[in-house]
Design a protein with these regions (language model features):
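Histidine/lysine/aspartate-rich catalytic loop segments that bind and position anionic ligands
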Residues: 91, 95-140
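Conserved functional loop/turn residues at catalytic and ligand-binding sites
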Residues: 39, 88, 96, 109, ...
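Short, charged, surface-exposed secondary-structure boundary motifs
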Residues: 101-105, 123-128, 143-148, 168-170, ...
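Glycine-rich phosphate-binding active-site loops on the catalytic face of alpha/beta enzymes
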Residues: 92-101, 135-142, 175-198
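Conserved beta-strand positions in the central sheet of alpha/beta enzyme cores
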Residues: 19, 44, 71, 93, ...
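Glycine-rich beta-to-alpha transition loops that act as phosphate-gripper elements at the mouths
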Residues: 21-23, 70-78, 94-97, 114-119, ...
Length: 217
């Protein structure tokens, strides 16, 4: 059984979380399989996916914990978070701050990533026990928001989500992101049923992030 610290390290080292939004549970599973085949381990199934909890349970039963790191996204409350953890999620991501969700995840020693947009919100999330703080919607400010927050809070582990793509992912990493959350720019091929494209895009993201990390280390 992998610990929370080990799972956090896996996310940080890979530098990316695949954010899965889909029109059906079947499509979500295919996307998850494609991004995994492309080398991405951390896969976030959002609660907007029909049957999202069953998708999480299916993935948890299909793959070993060292093969895939399943998370639940768009989680708004502690009740939903607990259901997802029981289904097999190893981390919980929220677009906003909810103290009860953070408490619950810490109770079960699972990773929790609440959403924030300002230094005040990030600090509040960290003080409440957040492991990583999701910066959302990141596209409103671009990579400079990471630099701005890490000015007074250099210790803050930040996960920008929204607006991250192959053309700018290097900028987000250079700015100091813990990792990046990528949705449509990664999984867009699924809309036309091209899961090979999703796999190829995942490979490109992994390559670019690794290259950027090597250059900045």
């Amino acid at each position: 059984m992998m610990s929370k610290i080990e799972n956090l390290k896996r996310i940080e080292e890979s530098g990316i979380v695949a954010v899965v939004r889909a029109e059906s549970s079947e499509q979500a599973l295919k996307i998850a399989e494609a991004v995994k085949a492309g080398g991405i381990q951390a896969i976030e199934i959002t609660m907007t996916v029909p049957g999202a909890v069953e998708v999480i349970r299916d993935l948890a039963q299909t793959y070993k914990k060292n093969e895939i790191l399943i998370g639940a996204g768009s989680v708004l409350d502690a009740e939903t978070a607990r259901i997802c953890l029981l289904a097999g999620a190893e981390y919980i991501v929220s677009p906003a701050f909810d103290i009860e969700t953070i408490k619950l995840c810490n109770r079960y020693q699972k990773i929790v990533m609440p959403g924030a947009m300002s230094v005040t919100e990030v600090l509040r999330a960290m003080e409440a026990g957040a492991d990583v703080v999701k910066i959302f919607p990141a596209e409103l400010f671009g990579p400079k928001i990471i630099e701005a927050i890490k000015g007074p809070l250099p210790q803050a582990p930040l996960l920008p989500t929204g607006g991250v793509n192959l053309n700018n992912v290097d900028q987000w990493i250079i700015a100091g992101s813990f990792a990046v959350g990528v949705g449509g720019a990664l999984t867009g091929g699924a809309k036309k049923g091209d899961y090979d494209e999703v796999k190829r895009t995942a490979i490109e993201f992994i390559k670019k992030i690794k290259s950027t990390k090597n250059q900045t280390s």
